[in-house]
A protein has these predicted regions:
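Hydrophobic h-region of N-terminal signal peptides that target proteins for export
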Residues: 12-20
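Conserved helix-turn-beta segment immediately C-terminal to the redox Cys motif
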Residues: 50-51, 60, 65-88, 108-111
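Thiol-based oxidoreductase modules, predominantly thioredoxin-like and allied folds used
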Residues: 81-98, 114-125
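Thiol-/selenol-based redox modules, centered on thioredoxin-like
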Residues: 130-133, 137-184
Length: 184
């Protein structure tokens, strides 16, 4: 009886480790690309070796003011190898209804944004853009935005380092500390 229980316990322990494998990364972030707001290809290979913050953005959201912090973060660390990339999405409350041209004008006029902003995309569900599918497949459900201004931090090796929800501001101690650690 004791041996049977011990064997069952060992088998359960062995199988419990099967699902805990490290992300395989069939592709790295730098192998992906997307169109920018002007319709030109934005190849992420140009960011190889840099630390990158991906943010799904929206013009009519309670978190839209985070554009200010994103631009400041970009200006502060871009010369050290840091990039912010904005991904407009209309999936949360219809808060990004504008065309690419309107989004670009809004960002430049209201926030002086000069970091890359992509074509408007889906960031969750079966229609999610390849970038967000890649993040989910390699980092799990915490990489899937629950609302606008969800942040995904990519390390210099092209892998997801961490994610931050909408309530975590771009210039928060948590994000700034992590970026500084990654840049040093």
């Amino acid at each position: 009886m004791f041996n049977k229980s011990l064997i069952t316990y060992i088998i359960i322990i062995m199988f419990s480790f099967l699902g805990k494998t490290e992300a395989k990364y069939e592709k790295l972030f730098f192998e992906l690309s997307i169109k920018n707001l002007d319709g030109k290809e934005l190849n992420f290979s140009q960011f190889k070796g840099k630390t990158i913050l991906l943010v799904n953005v929206a013009s009519k959201c309670g978190f839209t003011s985070q554009y200010t912090g994103l631009q400041l973060l970009y200006e502060t660390y871009r010369d050290k190898g840091f990039v912010v990339i904005g991904f407009p999405s209309n999936q949360f409350g219809g808060q990004e209804p504008g065309t690419n041209s309107e989004i670009k004008d809004f960002c430049e006029t209201n926030f002086n944004i000069d970091f890359p902003i992509t074509d408007k995309i889906a960031v969750k569900g079966s229609d999610a853009n390849e970038v967000y599918k890649w993040a989910k497949n390699n980092f799990g459900s915490s990489a899937v935005p629950k609302w606008n201004f969800h942040k995904i931090l990519i390390n210099r090796d092209g892998k997801v380092e961490d994610t931050y929800g909408s309530f975590v501001k771009p210039m928060s101690k948590k994000i700034v500390k992590k970026i500084e650690e990654m840049l040093n």
